[in-house]
Amino acid sequence: MSASASTAADFVRFALDEGVLRFGSFKVKSGRISPYFFNAGLFNSGRSVGTLAGFYAQALIDSGVAFDMLFGPAYKGIPLATATSVALAGHGAMAGRDVPFAFNRKEAKDHGEGGTLVGAPLTGKVVIIDDVITAGTSVRESVEIIRAAGAEPAAVLIALDRMERAGPDDALSPHSAVQDVARTYGIPVVSIASLADIMTLLQDDAQFAEHRAAVQAYRSKYGV
């Protein structure tokens, strides 16, 4: 489930402008050589994170998913949940609604309040927010934390769906990591943009035409 076409197109342009999305030849975590690379860690300034949070908020609103709060898995999800909560608070469609957020620590604290959870108590319908889904480990841990607190995972909200089949080349899964998460936990995965939106840019903008064939070939081999 992606955001509206205009939101997705604007986000792809924004990611390119920030150097977060690049074309070339990159060895990615799976070991594959990818013709594009998306590194959300390069959204690392107040302005860029503020704009990013606006895209997350819009994608969540566009999705129509009912939710009560946000959860950011440590570590990358922490600033994403925080900033998106701020963006939602200022969004006209929220009619002044104030959305709580929480996140977890990797290690339990043995002083003060203790425990691994920080922020608002986990309750109601909770949206897990992260940058991408690679293996689904972070989502699994988040779902366990949310359910253990008596709350309900409502959706996973990510920046980019790579639309890529999981597994080694000689045993490719018929599904992507995003599809596996949706099937395993019975919740939607909402993305701001996807590989399909990147392909649309490559097809529509002549300045990126040189990368079109490589990305299309990669999608044909690994895509879902």
UniProtKB/Swiss-Prot annotation:
SUPFAM superfamilies: PRTase-like. It catalyses: orotidine 5'-phosphate + diphosphate = orotate + 5-phospho-alpha-D-ribose 1-diphosphate. Orotate binds at F37, F38, T134, R162. Transmembrane segments: none annotated. GO terms for molecular function: magnesium ion binding; orotate phosphoribosyltransferase activity. Keywords: Glycosyltransferase, Magnesium, Pyrimidine biosynthesis, Transferase. Pathway: Pyrimidine metabolism; UMP biosynthesis via de novo pathway; UMP from orotate: step 1/2. Its cofactor is Mg(2+). Its EC number is 2.4.2.10. The keyword Membrane does not apply. 5-phospho-alpha-D-ribose 1-diphosphate binds at residues 29, 75-76, 105-106, 109, 111, 130-138. GO terms for biological process: 'de novo' pyrimidine nucleobase biosynthetic process; 'de novo' UMP biosynthetic process; pyrimidine ribonucleoside biosynthetic process. One of its GO terms (cellular component) is cytoplasm. CDD domains: PRTases_typeI. The keyword Magnesium applies. Belongs to the purine/pyrimidine phosphoribosyltransferase family. PyrE subfamily. NCBIfam families: pyrE (TIGR00336). Homodimer. Catalyzes the transfer of a ribosyl phosphate group from 5-phosphoribose 1-diphosphate to orotate, leading to the formation of orotidine monophosphate (OMP). HAMAP family: PyrE. This is Orotate phosphoribosyltransferase. The lineage of its organism: Bacteria, Pseudomonadati, Pseudomonadota, Betaproteobacteria, Burkholderiales.
